Swiss-Prot record:
Enzyme class: oxidoreductase
Encoding gene (name): argC
Keyword NADP found: yes
Assigned EC number: 1.2.1.38
Name this polypeptide is given: N-acetyl-gamma-glutamyl-phosphate reductase
Keywords per UniProt: Amino-acid biosynthesis, Arginine biosynthesis, Cytoplasm, NADP, Oxidoreductase
GO molecular function: N-acetyl-gamma-glutamyl-phosphate reductase activity; NAD binding; NADP+ binding
UniProt xrefs under PANTHER family: N-ACETYL-GAMMA-GLUTAMYL-PHOSPHATE REDUCTASE, CHLOROPLASTIC-RELATED (PTHR32338:SF10), N-ACETYL-GAMMA-GLUTAMYL-PHOSPHATE REDUCTASE, CHLOROPLASTIC-RELATED-RELATED (PTHR32338)
Catalytic-site annotation from UniProt: C146
Organism: Paenarthrobacter aurescens (strain TC1)
CDD domains: AGPR_1_actinobacAGPR_like, AGPR_1_C
Catalytic activity: N-acetyl-L-glutamate 5-semialdehyde + phosphate + NADP(+) = N-acetyl-L-glutamyl 5-phosphate + NADPH + H(+)
Family annotation (InterPro entries): AGPR_AS (IPR023013), AGPR_type-1 (IPR000706), NAD(P)-bd_dom_sf (IPR036291), NAGSA_dehydrogenase (IPR050085), Semialdehyde_DH_NAD-bd (IPR000534)
Pathway, per record: Amino-acid biosynthesis; L-arginine biosynthesis; N(2)-acetyl-L-ornithine from L-glutamate: step 3/4
Cell location: Cytoplasm
Amino acid sequence: MTISVAVSGASGYAGGEVLRLLAGHPNVTIGAITAHSNAGSRLGELQPHLHGLASRILEDTTVENLSGHDVVFLALPHGASAEIAAQLPEGTVVIDAGADHRLQDAAAWERFYGSAHAGTWPYGLPELPGQREALKGATRIAVPGCYPTSALLALTPGFANNLLLTDDVVIVSASGTSGAGKAAKVNLIGAEVMGSMSPYGVGGGHRHTPEIEQGLSNAAGEPVTVSFTPTLVPMSRGILTTATAKVGHGVSYAELRQAWADAYDDEPFVHLLPEGQWPTTKSVQGSNHAVMQLAFDAHTGRVIVTCAIDNLTKGTAGGAVQSMNIALGLDETAGLNLQGVAP
């Protein structure tokens, strides 16, 4: 089975990562490669690491250029995907790597994004309860945010098994600078980032907060309240999330560990590490893998889960390709058999 794929937003980090993975996919032929302000440029000028595609010329991001493909990846800023997606044929598999179709609550979308809600699509995180089935045959898929990917993988087993309390969840995530996109910003230049760490979106202001609460609430079957703080760290890619929650009365460490093991032992890309080994972002760099470890703080009655992912791969493009594979009935791991990079 060979499928034709178009990729929009190909000059950015997310679009470039989608192309990197698709270039090694055994079932994919890459069709239109589009950008907006960079239309007419050689891809190799903007994505010099994509050697096999370097001579391709970027087309303008229009419905006409994206139509006629089996699959369309939209790696566009929030607010830009919905208008294009609405005009693409219903039978085309459209995978939105932006935020436009993730949230179920229209009021939450309007509060955090300041525009009209475009609707909700099946959520592209197959490891969540029920999501793999929801993605089979889907023609519209919303790729999760990078922070929610790590946070939901970290805590969902506890909430899905009624082991955690819902009103005291604290999540702190450290991210590399590529999570902020490719546009030039003063706070992201080398002189500002090197040798420094800084929080942002503090006090519940980050747009991924309602997405994290949504996913954990779905797992728990009741509302979950989350305090989320992201931190910018001096590396190009990767996320290390530390997520903590109060455990229910009488819940033991053995019960916690068993719940996480049961959730992920058979997953191809999510791994609970052996006791005593802790996640590092370097170990998953460039791969679709997530690694995690958990501990139980008996003094405070909290579980602490750390989870490392590559924000551009498992946190964006890898999750998108994995979801495409499931939707089309392909091998779920096709194009994603990449290990981490060391040193």
